[in-house]
């Protein structure tokens, strides 16, 4: 179920070697843009920010996933708010965007709970599991987030 809502670049099935490669990749980054979600001293998910380039260099795209046993417990809402606060504080990024596949209603609700607003729907924008699907586009500005957490 997790892979159904992630980009195809996330390996499936996810092996121990995939995990080691990811840790090496994250360790080599100049800017902290990946956050591990830990529950009961176990890795339970990930939050990542992919900074834009050129004229979009003050933007970042948000990606995240959480292991299924932890769904519906408010963990992702809490962890996203914390990671976004940290990322905005330590970078000059002014805007974070997120793309959510049409069927992932829970993920849309999580984003809205922490202040993201839906900007539109890109129709048939993604090809996942052999099917074209709409992608819901969300954004959050640094100044809006600051006003929410005051």
Model feature map: region roles:
Residues 1, 34-150:
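Acyl-donor (CoA/ACP) binding surface of acyl/acetyltransferases
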Residues 1-20, 143-150:
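A short, well-structured alpha-helix characteristic of acyl/acetyltransferase catalytic modules
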